[in-house]
């Protein structure tokens, strides 16, 4: 454990950020998984709706600094490609 006051504060901040990032990433995975399940089932209407929801979640994660913008763009592109194949 750190003895320096600023480092003790930093440890708390890092832990709070880690938990927030973990929650955001978990919700992203859930949103993308729901889209994939709808796409696998062949439900085009539901897949398109879930694609939009997951896309918004990815954009929010980028704005919070949880994931890189290129990673979000790559995932959104893959979802769009999958939705267009239905």
From Swiss-Prot:
Protein name: Small ribosomal subunit protein bS20
Membrane-spanning intervals of the chain: none
Gene3D superfamilies linked: Ribosomal protein S20 (1.20.58.110)
UniProt-listed Pfam families: Ribosomal_S20p
Alphabetical list of InterPro entries matching this protein: Ribosomal_bS20 (IPR002583), Ribosomal_bS20_sf (IPR036510)
A single BP term in Gene Ontology: translation
HAMAP family with a match to the protein in the record: Ribosomal_bS20
SUPFAM superfamilies in the record: Ribosomal protein S20
GO CC, one annotated term: cytosol
Sequence similarity: Belongs to the bacterial ribosomal protein bS20 family.
Gene: rpsT
Species: Saccharopolyspora erythraea (strain ATCC 11635 / DSM 40517 / JCM 4748 / NBRC 13426 / NCIMB 8594 / NRRL 2338)
Keyword line: Ribonucleoprotein, Ribosomal protein, RNA-binding, rRNA-binding
Lineage of the species this protein comes from: Bacteria, Bacillati, Actinomycetota, Actinomycetes, Pseudonocardiales
Functional note: Binds directly to 16S ribosomal RNA.
GO MF annotation terms: small ribosomal subunit rRNA binding; structural constituent of ribosome
Region (Disordered) residue spans: 1-25
